[in-house]
A protein has these predicted regions:
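Conserved active-site tyrosine of GNAT-family acetyltransferases
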Residues: 123, 128
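Short glycine/proline-centered loop/turn elements that form peptide/ligand docking sites
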Residues: 116-119, 133-143
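Short hydrophobic/aromatic beta-strand or adjacent loop that forms the aromatic wall/cage
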Residues: 41, 142-146
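Acetyl-CoA-dependent GNAT
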Residues: 5-70, 74, 87-88, 93, ...
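Short, hinge-like loop/turn segments at secondary-structure boundaries
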Residues: 120-122, 150
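A short, internal acetyl-CoA/4′-phosphopantetheine-binding micro-motif in the GNAT/acyltransferase core
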Residues: 71-79, 108-110
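Conserved GNAT acetyl-CoA-binding A-motif
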Residues: 94-115
């Protein structure tokens, strides 16, 4: 696979990929918010031969961190390096902006759901560590696990 992180993402890229991932992104209102975020924040597309394979939206969290607000990869391309390449871009952006950390929020382990078990395993494999699980962010029916990775300093 000749993968390149070549361009900024747009809302249409976001909606196209999220539509293929209903196990993770099945709430239309949330997907619309992700598409809006792709337009206003730093958003990147991984592509091959002009086809969008995955995308990532980054949000500056202030003094110390860049947050991976969204990471989505076409389901047929999981475990092929697309997500890892996007996380590497997030780390590069954090270093460029002198941010020592990259964070990500995902569904916490206290409410088991197999797709998110794979998500957490991916984030741990690329270097994130669990920091804290909270119910105050997304509600008790959707516990939020905050994960963190040091990229510099």
């Amino acid at each position: 696979m000749t993968l390149k992180i070549v361009r900024r993402a747009a809302g249409a890229d976001c909606m196209s990929i999220l539509a293929q991932l209903p196990e993770w992104f099945g709430i239309p209102e949330s997907n619309a918010e992700y598409a809006e975020a792709a337009e206003r924040e730093q958003a990147w597309v991984a592509e091959e031969s002009g086809e969008a394979l995955g995308l990532m939206v980054l949000v500056d969290q202030g003094l110390s961190a860049i947050d991976v607000h969204l990471l989505a990869v076409r389901p047929n391309l999981h475990r092929q390096g697309v997500g890892r390449a996007l996380i590497e871009r997030a780390c590069a952006v954090a270093r460029e902006l002198a941010k020592p950390y990259v964070t990500v929020k995902t569904r916490g382990p206290s409410l088991p759901y197999e797709p998110y078990e794979h998500t957490r395993a991916f984030y741990e494999a690329v270097g994130f560590e669990p920091l804290e699980e909270l119910t105050a962010i997304w509600g008790p029916e959707n516990p939020c696990l905050i994960m963190i990775m040091r990229v510099s300093g």
